[in-house]
Amino acid sequence: MFRLHLFYGFFVALLLSSCAPKHYQLTGIERTRIIIDSRYDQNPDEAAVRFMAPYKRVNDSIMAPVFGRVAHNMHPQRPESDLSNLLPDILIWAAKDYNESPVFAVYNMGGIRSDLYKGDVTYEHILSVAPFENKICFITLTGELVMKLFEQIARRGGEGVSKGVELVISKSDAGYRLVSARLHGQEIDPTAEYRVVTLDYLQEGNDGMTALSEGKDVVKPQDPNNCSRFLIMNYFQDKHARGEIVDAQVEGRIKIQ
């Protein structure tokens, strides 16, 4: 009888040990790059094409309309680029619809998610550039906070700023540092107040620009039509109606010495 109990005890212990959770340990990582391009269009799965056709028609009807044209390829990069100049300028342009007259605009590089390419600009292109729900936002900063903001922009190696902003940044092993800042050719008055237009995401102090969260008289329109992509779309539509092609250039708004 003792041997029988011993056998059953051993069997139960073996069963429990086999059911215990296994602990895995990573021993290595391998990766490869799979390029998704037109090669996959050469032999499409006909059943999949038929299944997707009605959804594709709806998607194309939304994404394909042309809202304007750009004069050349535009790519976002620090410290300054044509595209990162265009977008804050669009915020300045849009401000009139809110009865606002901002002195300058800030648009974060991280919020620019794609390039624009020479020629027609569709809703798909605009959505690719500005896919987030970031909305236009207005705030008043003292000159002291403006300088703090420009110092934060300098430490990041540059962000999108509107025409009239002139920043000089130095670069060393310790990083980037603001050397000088001017607005529309004038020195920043630390006691003056400056109206700024930006995105609500930045006004909350994100992307290292905490100075924007320290201002006052904040106006944050919450209607979905105030999202940056719709403002960009409206800008292109306006230019297109006037027969104008959208253009932007690097102008020396942010210089690194």
Explain the meaning of each model-derived region:
Residues 15-18:
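C-terminal motif of bacterial Sec signal peptides marking the signal peptidase cleavage site
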Residues 31-115:
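Hard-cation-handling environments
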Residues 9-12:
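Sec-dependent N-terminal signal peptides
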Residues 1-7:
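Bacterial N-terminal signal peptides that target proteins for export
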